[in-house]
Amino acid sequence: MTRVRIDKAGLGRGIYITGHCANENSGSAEATLVCAAMTTLAQTIAQNVFDSEDTGDTDIIDVTLRSGQAVISYVTDDDGLNTAVDGICKGFDMLEENYPEYVSCYRGER
């Protein structure tokens, strides 16, 4: 099971992903594809955050991408970045809706 937590607090954002879909059923091509989709979404968010930092619009708190874990946290007032990340995060929601045995999402806002 892969768990995704998406937090929003003021100008701060955090996306925390833990787990592996493929480990649930190591022989499942479906689990492998879902895990690959999760990885692609996380890497896309990270790249958008890095691009926004390069323009001076975002302060990165942490970007860690490794097997079974992703942490992406940042502070920004860049509406374009926030819109892009919100759109990408809809991909996590869609994966949870279609593959609840592999993905669990939680959203927190303060």
List each language-model region with its residue ranges.
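N-terminal intrinsically disordered, cationic/polar leader segments
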Residues: 1-33, 43, 47-110
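A short mixed-secondary-structure module that forms the rim of ligand-binding clefts
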Residues: 35-38
